[in-house]
Amino acid sequence: MADIPADRKKIVQEGWSRLFSDIEQPSYIQKFPSQESLYVSFFEQCAFDDFDLTLLRFLKARKFVVTDSSDMLANAIVWRQQANLRSIMVRGENGLNQNFVKASMYFIWGQDKKGRAIVFLNLHNFIPPKNTKDMEELKALILYAMENARLFLDSEQNAAKGVLGLVDLTYFSRKNIDLDFARVFAETFQNYYPEILGQALIVGSGFRMALFEGVWSIGKYFLDPEVRSKVTFCKPAQVSGYVDSKYIPLSMHGQFDETKLYERAPPETAGIGKPENYEELDKEYVDAAKEFIRLTREWIYAAGKPQEAEIEEKRKAFKYECKKLWRKGVALRPPNIYQRLGLIDANGHVDWSKA
């Protein structure tokens, strides 16, 4: 597991101390069906990588103000339960609106020259929701995609930390504009998945770029200034400076044909998880969350004492066991397209050489 940078150790400890105090308040607990479901949501939010790196993402998003960062993470834990993310992931792709899935509005493919996974946003394929049902189904698609994106953010493999967002404006037109959904997307992205974006490239030229710039003049204010600072506008010919040609779509003069992506993948199969499997898994999540909290408090109290190093190593080893337990939950779900293509193995290792 990752080591906390020496200059961030104290603020990470302060962040955990504040968060633990907050989530143990009766007023917070009552936001969940039960205290056990709180622990499950906490575990699923934080254990996908290294607990401390998860907290650091929230700290960085709030400029290392502990109270603001703790509140942000606490809100994300509540949101995760209220958004029924478990249900979305258990249903898998087949539980989503298939018109949205096959439209290839949002998908992950390849890595850039810094080793970051590439998240493609094909705005010309965006289908604006026509009613409340469409909006909810589109939200479910985005949440499903974002949860799968976390599989590519393992700090043991993704030393670059974050993804490259590649926004394709090749055939972008007025029919693809929906500022209401843009606001929903921005709020979800930056409030509940902070610091996942390493850089974003807006790729286009001519009239289509001019059209998008008009939208951007309004939409950019949905984003925090820190997120806006990561956005770069470029022409299709410049993308090769960031990404190898084999991962660049045909529309940007590359070799990757995204229209064939789902044709290559075997059909989705049902997940192996039964209700009783998830009940047992949740018990393990609850126990693990409680043990992480206990060990972290012990680590905080041991600061500067002879036993500090020993407790730190014990806690580090436990964080790794938690990551393996989190992957156990992933294995119960229907396999996503990247798993079906053999790009992600059972241990969570990503191998783009198989693309």
From Swiss-Prot:
Pfam families: CRAL_TRIO, CRAL_TRIO_N. GO terms for molecular function: phosphatidylinositol transfer activity. One of its GO terms (biological process) is intermembrane phospholipid transfer. GO terms for cellular component: cell division site; cell tip; cytosol; nucleus. InterPro entries: CRAL-TRIO_dom, CRAL-TRIO_dom_sf, CRAL/TRIO_N_dom, CRAL/TRIO_N_dom_sf, PITP/CRAL-TRIO. It comes from the Eukaryota. Residues 93-260 form the CRAL-TRIO domain. This is CRAL-TRIO domain-containing protein C365.01. The lineage of its organism: Eukaryota, Fungi, Dikarya, Ascomycota, Taphrinomycotina.
